[in-house]
C-alpha cells in the first residue's frame, strides 16, 4: 500500500534518508539547484509546516521508502510538481507519478499539473509523456 508522509512530520532518520537521496549524484544531476546543506535541509523541512504553497512527501510502499514527491506554487488551477525515487531502487517512477497525480487532483483539487525537467533527463521526460503530459519550451 502506498502512503505519503509530510516532510514536516518526518523523523530525524527519515530526514537524513531524504537528505542523502537529494544529494546523491544520481538524483542531484537532474536538479537545477546545487547540493543542499544538512542544516538547510532540516530547516527547510521544518518550514513546510506553515507553508500553504508547498507540500513535500516521502512516499512509502508498505513500509519501504520509495521516493519523494512535491507540489509547489499551488493555486486553485494548477501546481508544479517534482518527483524522484530512491536512487537504490528501480521501477517505481510510474507508481510515484500515478499517486502524485491522484493526490493533486483529489486533494489539492488542481485542474492542471506542471513539471520542469532538464533536457538531458530523458527518463523523466519519457515518464511524463507516457502519462499524457505535453512538452513546452
Task: Pin down the residues of each PLM region.
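Alpha-helix boundary/capping residues
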Residues: 21-25, 34, 48, 131
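Secondary-structure transition/hinge residues
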Residues: 26, 49, 105-108
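Short secondary-structure capping micro-motifs at structural edges
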Residues: 45-46, 70
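Short loop/turn motifs at secondary-structure junctions and domain boundaries
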Residues: 47-53
Amino acid at each position: 500500500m502506498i502512503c505519503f508522509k509530510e516532510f514536516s512530520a518526518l523523523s530525524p532518520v527519515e530526514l537524513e534518508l531524504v537528505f542523502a537521496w537529494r544529494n546523491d549524484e544520481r538524483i542531484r544531476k537532474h536538479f537545477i539547484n546545487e547540493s543542499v546543506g544538512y542544516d538547510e535541509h532540516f530547516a527547510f523541512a521544518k518550514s513546510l509546516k506553515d507553508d500553504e504553497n508547498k507540500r513535500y512527501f516521502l512516499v512509502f510502499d508498505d513500509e519501504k521508502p520509495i521516493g519523494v514527491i512535491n507540489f509547489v506554487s499551488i493555486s486553485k488551477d494548477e501546481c508544479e510538481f517534482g518527483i524522484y525515487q530512491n536512487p537504490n531502487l528501480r521501477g517505481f517512477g510510474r507508481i510515484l507519478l500515478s499517486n502524485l497525480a491522484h493526490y493533486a487532483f483529489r486533494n489539492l483539487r488542481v485542474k492542471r499539473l506542471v513539471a520542469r525537467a532538464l533536457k538531458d533527463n530523458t527518463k523523466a521526460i519519457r515518464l511524463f509523456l507516457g502519462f499524457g503530459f505535453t512538452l513546452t519550451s
